[in-house]
Design a protein with these regions (language model features):
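Signature tryptophan residues that serve as conserved aromatic anchors
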Residues: 24, 84-87
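ABC ATPase nucleotide-binding domains
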Residues: 91-111
Length: 111
């Protein structure tokens, strides 16, 4: 007869895909199981992401490889500290110019 199997054990589940905040994912990009995309990362069109992507890093290709960091390390650290995406809607509205311009000094003072 047929053998009954537990389908949850039929494949090697590498875990959830975790997408950070302020991330842009290009058209037809594929992100494999168990991968974490850091805050502010950019995934290129049709990239196949097989490994974690650090915050504010641009990746592309098959498999996806880092192309460059979006900002200098001190700017990335400041943005990760500020976490403007956790602000209230009102606070974002008051600081939208600084967010859109990427003015870190204004963001750090954002009230």
């Amino acid at each position: 007869g047929l053998e009954k199997k537990d389908v949850t054990n039929a494949w090697d589940n590498k875990g959830d895909i975790i997408i950070g905040n302020d991330v842009w994912i290009g058209y037809e990009a594929a992100i494999l199981a168990g991968v974490t995309i850091g805050d502010g990362a950019i995934i290129g069109t049709r990239a196949v992401v097989t490994k974690d992507v650090p915050p504010y890093t641009i990746v592309g290709g098959v498999p996806a490889k880092p192309i460059k960091r979006r900002f200098p390390e001190e700017t990335i650290s400041a943005l990760l500290e500020i976490q403007w995406w956790n602000w209230s809607e009102e606070r974002i509205a008051r600081n939208i110019g600084a967010i859109q311009s990427g003015n870190i000094d204004q963001l750090e003072q954002g009230v």
